[in-house]
Swiss-Prot record:
Its cofactor is Mg(2+). ATP binds at D120, E157. Pyridoxal kinase involved in the salvage pathway of pyridoxal 5'-phosphate (PLP). Catalyzes the phosphorylation of pyridoxal to PLP. CDD domains: pyridoxal_pyridoxamine_kinase. It comes from the Bacteria. GO terms for cellular component: cytosol. Signal peptide: none annotated. This is Pyridoxal kinase PdxY. The gene is pdxY. Substrate binds at S18, D235.
Length: 299
């Protein structure tokens, strides 16, 4: 007679980001992919808007930073913080929100020292420049990034965080290693550079680079002609990478799976021609991508 094995509960992730009622940015881009990967997600929303600001008009409210601490107090009162495997943060619109997120990370780590913090340092992008308040890049660099185990800047944000110009692969590697040196000691110190377009890459592609202490991996996908560029892709890739990294504990594998999933989302979005990314319609791609883009070791 054999005894049945005990059920395995999902890992828990605390995600502190913006929220929109319509469309997919912030937590509305991170929540479902993480759930589809098998995680429980505790969301704390920093804003509640009707839609993302890329439309030029929206309704809703920005929540006070104190709400982050208040909601975390309520979660902590349930006695579950020791079960939190990771914290994910995205757009932080004020100095108070940066401080509140950093304090939330510290409280989770007090309860579970093994918990990871994945910081998506949303500050700007190529073609748009810095789109947050002028004081925020320095605050994110000096307060949030040093607490992070994983950081997911786009190419523009990598340059902003390091003060280095990135146009070639070696420059991207050097800047990523420089940024790695500022992350929290004791963690994986993993830098994931998204939306990488470099002079020495093949034409018609876009890349993501993952750099750890053990090496570096590059994943390349076709560059789809999405005009205008779709909002929420950075939020989605940060969530997908974190989820796959927690599942595999391997940066190269997580990079390949997350980029393959994101390409499928964007390819479907392009084919149907919608302004919002097709996160729900492409959900099967999160766990079993129909087209796998391998991560090539480059260092």
């Amino acid at each position: 007679m054999t005894s049945s094995s005990a059920p395995v509960l999902p890992q828990n992730i605390l995600s502190i980001q913006s929220w929109v009622s319509y469309g997919h940015v912030g937590n509305a881009a991170a929540l479902f992919p993480l759930q589809r990967l098998g995680f429980e997600v505790w969301t704390i929303n920093t804003v509640q808007f009707s839609n993302h600001t890329g439309y030029g008009e929206w309704t809703g409210s920005v929540f006070p930073p104190e709400l982050v601490a208040d909601l975390l107090n309520g979660i902590a009162a349930r006695g579950v913080l020791p079960t939190c495997a990771a914290v994910l943060s995205g757009y932080m619109g004020s100095e108070g929100t940066v401080s509140a997120v950093v304090e939330a990370v510290r409280r989770v780590r007090e309860a579970n020292p093994a918990a990871l913090y994945c910081c998506d340092p949303v500050m700007g992008d190529v073609g748009r420049g810095v789109f947050v308040r002028p004081e925020l890049p320095d605050l994110i660099r000096t307060q949030a990034v040093p607490e992070a185990d994983i950081v997911t800047p786009n190419q523009f944000e990598l340059e902003l965080l390091t003060g280095r110009r990135v146009t070639r692969l070696q420059e991207a590697l050097d800047a990523s290693r420089m940024l790695r040196g500022t992350l929290r000691e004791g963690g994986p110190r993993l830098v994931v550079v998204t939306s990488l377009v470099r002079e020495d890459a093949p034409q018609g592609v876009i890349e993501t680079l993952a750099v750890t202490g053990e090496g570096a991996w590059l994943c390349r996908t076709p560059l789809l002609p999405l005009d205008p560029p779709r909002n929420g892709t950075g939020d989605a890739i940060a969530a997908l990478f974190l989820g796959h990294y927690l599942r595999t504990q391997d940066a190269g594998t997580a990079l390949s799976l997350s980029m393959s999933a994101l390409f499928a989302v964007l390819d479907l979005t392009h084919r149907v021609g919608t302004r919002e990314i097709q996160l729900v319609a492409a959900q099967d791609e999160y766990t079993r991508p129909s087209r796998v883009f391998e991560a090539e070791r480059v260092a």
